[in-house]
Amino acid sequence: MPIALDAMGGDHAPDEIVAGAVQAVREHGIPVVLVGAARPLQDALSLHGATTEIPIIRAEEALAMDEGALASLRRPRSSIAVACHLVRRGDACAVVSAGSTAGVVATGKLRLRGQPGVLRPAIAVVLPTLPTPTILLDAGANAEVKPEMLVQFAHLGAAYAEAALEIDHPRIGLLTIGSEPEKGNKLVKRAHELLSAAPGLDFAGNIEGHDLLTGAVNVIVTDGFTGNVALKTMEGSVRYAFAELREVIKESRTARLGGLLQRKQLRELHRRLDPDVHGGAVLLGLNGTVVIAHGASQAKGVSAACVLAATLARQGVVARIGERLAASHRPHRLW
């Protein structure tokens, strides 16, 4: 079953989106259908000689990158809406979009609906920690949450870690301002109490910002506001560190020689930290697989997002989440 790729979402749509689709098909053998305006997609496919390899599902409307949830309601035939409809109808196994995060989240909730018992869907990102990756959620879907939602995010993240990362009994950490149980605001304190008593979760307690990349836990739970700020801070820190490193290497012949000798290792480090390599974030808690690629994704990032989506669909992450939620206490739906 193909990936439904929103070809009109992203800073570099549709050209880089189409190029990424071609990479996914030719290099990874992943079937893709492009969803968007027919004429520009046909023109872009012809540049790659791929007009017969990748089908197009027509959707002449698109959400702009600065448009949010309300715009998704006003455009029921937008490319992201049609892509979600394909998954709901069973004609595609997953949705991939580099479009507006708010628009993708709102459209996903409207078109795919939440899994039984889900309070809110959450955006999960995989951090390149050692020895195993760490999942951070929520990374931006819900700026305001209730304590019960953080418990459910822990279940979503645990199911993702088990299915996608093959981690048995993932350890859960709650992001706050101190390791002691009493540290944090009312939301965090109550969430700590609930997580400590939640069956089926290996809750390791509170973690602080400096623990984000240490691999101390397998799943980090927080609200979407804090999670998004943390994620963007890490991305900016990585860019700053590499910029400083380039300047330091230029300072002397010895430094330049050292840079040349370590070039292979530096490239590997850059690859590990490159968002394009990891494919994007995953919107968990819906009746379908949704991958949100970085808005500035080039072809490589789009292709990686398609690979991630196909992998998650094949591993049955949505079903695994449903099983885990069914085994836990089901709260009432809030949306």
Each model region followed by its residue ranges:
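Short, glycine-rich nucleotide/cofactor-binding loops
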Residues: 3-15, 141-151, 292-298
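Glycine-rich phosphate/diphosphate-binding loop of Rossmann-like nucleotide-binding domains
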Residues: 15-16, 31-33, 39-42, 143-209, ...
